A protein has these predicted regions:
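Alpha-helical transmembrane segments in inner-membrane proteins
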Residues: 4-365
């Protein structure tokens, strides 16, 4: 009789403990979801504020009254038309381009890291950046127009991805290490081709243009090209965003993905292709910009963890904000504009070192 009562009391205690544990887990999830929403709100507000601030900054001074008047109403005087041209033809396309490129490179880096299961994967790992740079340099050396040169950059960026997949097919393997090694081979070849073009280029005219392109800059943007690439960026981001949950399963291995009913080979084609298209389009807009696709995903992981459902949206916002700040500093620090690639490297490398040391200290605890 006593044993029966004792067993019933144990069952009641187990039920109470399980209920409390469930309540604690539910409260923790609610707190995490609330903090995640607050982070998204903060990033969106910061991005909008930085975009508006960038409209005032530049060699041509604009007051708050000028910007508000031009954005809300139609300019009438000749002087106000000049200011409107500065905003709508120069600064606004540049702000949009910096945001798109920052978000695109960051999301592409996070996608590569998930698919290749390598934390050091970046937009350079599959040779897309190097191939796009070669395409642009080839157009410059051949004296082609700006539009044709950027088209060459995009075509060669896609060609590099086809070569990587071709090497993986010849190797008859879709393992991450094989893909990375194939990308390194393709990247090395296109880096060598760029060096050949720099060697053959005219040192008085063509060579400086190639070097300036490789350093990265938004100074030579074409407004129509910026707006024409917006749908491409949005489509690629939409594909990755819709498949963001599958990256969590892919990181566990192909066998786990098959158990969950996924097609790992198809995902390993769709996700890298979408990321590579954004990388090529980014190189088309501003040339070579490093560290963004490597540093920003690591920074966001320190904030929201490894869940790609939260990682991808926050990475896009952080990348856009980061490169927008870098571009604003590039045209505000000195009278002569500093290439964006230089400032992104000077900022990204110390930031990555900080995250690296912080992670090492956390592992030792």
């Amino acid at each position: 009789m006593l044993k029966g009562k004792y067993r019933r009391s144990l069952k009641c205690d187990d039920i109470v403990f399980t209920r409390k544990l469930f309540q604690q887990h539910y409260c923790l999830q609610m707190l995490q979801q609330k903090s995640y929403r607050q982070l998204l709100t903060l990033l969106c507000f910061s991005l909008v504020l930085m975009s508006l601030s960038s409209l005032f900054i530049g060699r041509y001074s604009l007051s708050v009254q000028d910007v508000v008047y031009i954005l809300l109403g139609a300019p009438h005087s000749e002087h106000s038309r000049e200011k409107a041209a500065v905003i709508f033809d120069l600064r606004l396309p540049r702000i949009i381009a910096a945001g798109m490129v920052g978000a695109g490179l960051s999301v592409a880096g996070a996608t590569y890291q998930a698919v290749l299961k390598n934390a050091l994967a970046s937009p350079d790992v599959l040779g897309t950046s190097s191939a796009s740079a070669f395409g642009a340099a080839l157009g410059i050396v051949m004296g082609l127009s700006y539009q044709v040169s950027t088209g060459c950059a995009f075509v060669f960026g896609m060609l590099s991805l086809a070569l990587v997949f071709g090497l993986c097919f010849l190797r008859q393997s879709q393992e991450a290490i094989v893909t990375i090694l194939s990308g390194l081979i393709v990247a090395s070849v296109f880096v060598a081709f760029v060096s050949v073009l720099k060697y053959l280029a005219d040192p008085e005219d063509t060579l400086p243009a190639i070097v300036f392109w490789l350093m990265g800059s938004f100074s030579s943007l074409v407004k129509t090209e910026v707006f024409s690439l917006i749908p491409l960026f949005m489509f690629c981001y939409y594909v990755i965003y819709r498949l963001r949950w599958t990256m969590n399963i892919l990181s566990l291995g192909d066998d786990e993905a098959k158990i969950q009913g996924l097609h790992p080979l198809l995902l390993k084609i769709i996700l890298p292709v979408s990321a590579s298209v954004m990388i090529s389009a980014s190189v088309v807009l501003c040339g070579g910009v490093g560290w963004v696709g490597l540093v920003i995903p690591h920074l966001v992981r320190a904030l929201v963890g490894n869940n790609h459902g939260k990682l991808i949206p926050v990475t896009a916002l952080c990348g856009a904000l980061f490169l927008l700040v870098i571009d604003t500093l590039a045209r505000a620090l000195t009278y002569a504009e500093i290439p964006v690639g230089i400032l992104s490297a000077l900022t990204g490398a110390p930031l990555f070192a900080f995250l690296y040391v912080r992670g090492a200290n956390h592992d030792h605890r």
